[in-house]
């Protein structure tokens, strides 16, 4: 099954691998007992992104954080499908079934929020509650012809992809991370975050060739479970617009804002994020 496995991957005693129905291998970490909570990472991240949630919340729930295919360490250790949001939705659904977890409390951040949203739409029986933190993707407002990201953002992404493909990795990552958070975010980030982002840099050009689907009134009306929408007070307007619209479109939605935080609100203020999430799940 393994293609090119770095022994360091196996150094984490909590790291496990699940083989799902399609034959691919999904790395994940798991801690705690109780109702299952699955954490879905976003761009440049993997299961490590949720460290500040897994440890404290595992005292109350069965916390599981997978790495989606092509993200570390799956890129080194696992058989994978093609890169794409649809593939990630399908493999995550297969993971929930293979692990006999349904229904789960599903938590997604940024691009992972889009994956979680689409999974809840397509596989409603697998999801008990849905939490979307700064969900990524374009917004299809009523009366608009076609939803897409702003042209300036697409131009920036093309530049970032070119830099990474040419080996100018850290400056490219800095440009992207600052664009989805606040200027200077990359330089202020922790060594652990920068290491994780560098480990996953090769996924970014692939991601830019695979646009996320738009949120719309129609698609949001198909979410049947209780939903918590979290944004950061200082998150870029695109994410806050998504949260604001989804709050009005999803029938059983509630919204919470983390004061002083930007896009990585669960890392910047984990105590507030964890408190909101636990209160919502325990309701």
Q: Where do the protein language model's features map onto the residues?
A:
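Conserved acidic catalytic loop of the alpha/beta-hydrolase fold
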Residues: 86-104
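Gly/Ala-rich beta-loop-alpha elbow adjacent to hydrolase catalytic centers
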Residues: 108, 112, 116
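Conserved loop-alpha-helix segment in the C-terminal half of the alpha/beta-hydrolase fold
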Residues: 217-261
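Conserved alpha/beta-hydrolase catalytic His-Asp/Glu region
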Residues: 165-205
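Catalytic histidine-centered segment of alpha/beta-hydrolase-like enzymes
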Residues: 261-274
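Short beta-strand immediately N-terminal to the catalytic nucleophile in serine-hydrolase-like folds
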Residues: 106-108, 133
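Flexible "cap/lid" loop of the alpha/beta hydrolase fold
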Residues: 117, 121-164
């Amino acid at each position: 099954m393994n293609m090119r496995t770095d022994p360091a991957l196996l150094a984490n005693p909590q790291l496990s691998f699940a083989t799902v129905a399609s034959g691919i291998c999904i790395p994940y970490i798991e801690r705690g007992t109780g109702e299952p909570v699955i954490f879905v990472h976003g761009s440049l991240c993997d299961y490590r992104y949720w460290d500040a949630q897994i440890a404290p919340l595992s005292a109350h729930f069965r916390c599981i954080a997978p790495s989606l295919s092509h993200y570390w360490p799956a890129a080194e250790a696992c058989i994978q499908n093609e890169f794409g949001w649809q593939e990630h939705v399908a493999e995550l659904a297969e993971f929930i079934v293979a692990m006999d977890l349904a229904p789960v409390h599903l938590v997604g951040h940024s691009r992972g929020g889009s994956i979680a949203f689409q999974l809840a739409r397509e596989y409603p029986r697998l999801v008990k509650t849905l939490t979307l933190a700064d969900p990524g993707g374009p917004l299809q407002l009523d009366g608009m012809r076609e939803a897409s990201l702003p042209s300036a953002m697409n131009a920036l992404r093309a530049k970032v992809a070119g830099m990474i493909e040419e080996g100018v990795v850290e400056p490219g990552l800095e440009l992207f991370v600052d664009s989805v958070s606040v200027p200077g975010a990359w330089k202020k980030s922790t060594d652990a975050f920068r290491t994780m982002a560098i480990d996953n840099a090769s996924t970014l050009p692939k991601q830019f060739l695979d646009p996320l689907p738009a949120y719309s009134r129609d698609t949001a009306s198909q979410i049947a479970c209780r939903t918590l929408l979290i944004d950061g007070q200082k998150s870029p307007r695109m994410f806050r617009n998504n949260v604001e619209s989804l709050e009005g479109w999803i029938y059983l939605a509630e919204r919470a804002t983390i004061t002083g935080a930007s896009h990585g609100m669960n890392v910047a203020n984990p105590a507030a994020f964890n408190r909101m999430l636990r209160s919502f799940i325990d309701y």
